[in-house]
Amino acid sequence: MLGSTDLVLLGKVVATHGIRGQLSVVPFSGEFSTILSMQTVYLSGPDNRKESFEVDRAAVHRNRVLLTLKGFANINEVLHLVGRELFARRDQFPPLDEGEFYWCDLIGLSVTTSEGLSLGRIEEIIATGSNDVYVVRDGEREYLIPALEDIVVGVDLDKGIMTVSPTEGLLDL
């Protein structure tokens, strides 16, 4: 489980935007609000160390987030940041409503059926537009579990377990 100060990978700087030093970031989760709420972000350096940067402004532009970092005023000052991964501290994330979870909290959870059958662990999450899909692997098999209320019947982050009630045939694919 993540600690409150652990860094969480949120996206990647894929380009600059304009001439005033804005960075174009693709969020990995398809969710913009977390990045938009950050006051400080961390970018991976060439040696994989994380450098912290204060956020001046953040806005959504098409399917990306445009970040303006304090102290950078033109494109030439930020070109070296393109290609870096963007991280934030877990304790900076805005609170969620009951029953909502951040992807970083779900990755690694053990998944069992309501009958007690162990399916494996959540290894990745796919954003489909209508609902997320959890990719659960046990080493031999892979299950694609849609994130729907009637299928995901329980999540216990403290115990590290997600309980699912799969529809008929879901686990046969």
Swiss-Prot record:
Residues 98-170 form the PRC barrel domain. The PRC barrel domain binds ribosomal protein uS19. The keyword Acetylation does not apply. Transmembrane segments: none annotated. One of its GO terms (biological process) is rRNA processing. One of its GO terms (molecular function) is ribosome binding. Its main location: cytoplasm. The keyword Cytoplasm applies. The gene is rimM. This is Ribosome maturation factor RimM. Belongs to the RimM family. Keywords: Chaperone, Cytoplasm, Ribosome biogenesis, rRNA processing. It comes from Geobacter metallireducens (strain ATCC 53774 / DSM 7210 / GS-15). InterPro entries: PRC_barrel-like_sf, PRC_RimM, RimM, RimM_N, RimM_N_sf, Transl_B-barrel_sf.
